[in-house]
Amino acid sequence: MVPGTSSLTQDLVRAINGEYSAIACYAKLAEKAPNQEIRKQILEIRQDEVRHYHIFSQIFSEITGTKPNPQITEECPTAYRVALKFAFQDEQHTVDFYLDVAEKTQDPFIKEQFKRAAADEQNHAVWFLWFLRV
C-alpha cells in the first residue's frame, strides 16, 4: 500500500457514504418539491452526487483492489423544509471536507476530483439556500 493511502481510503469511504446518503435523500426531497422547477433542479443536483459517487468509488477500487460497500450514514429528515436546511448544511460541511482531502493528497488526479466535487457541493449549497427562500 502506498504511504498515506490508509487515510485517503478512510476519506474515500466517508465521501462515498456521504454521496450515497445524499443520493437517497435527494430522491425523497425531489418528490416533496413544491413545483416542477425545484424538483428538476434537485434531481440535477442528485445526478451530480451520482457522478461523485462513481468517481470516488472508482478511485477507492483502484487504491484498494476492492469495491466499496456504501452505507447510508445520515438519515434524511422527512419534512421538506427541514430536509432543505439539512441538505444546505451538509453540502457546506462537505465542501470543507473535500477541500481538506484535496489538500492532503499528492495524487494530481485525486486532488482535481475532490476540488471539482467541492465546487459542485458549493453550488448545491447555494441552490438549497435559494429553495429555502421560496
Which residues are covered by each model-predicted region?
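Non-heme di-metal
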Residues: 1-134
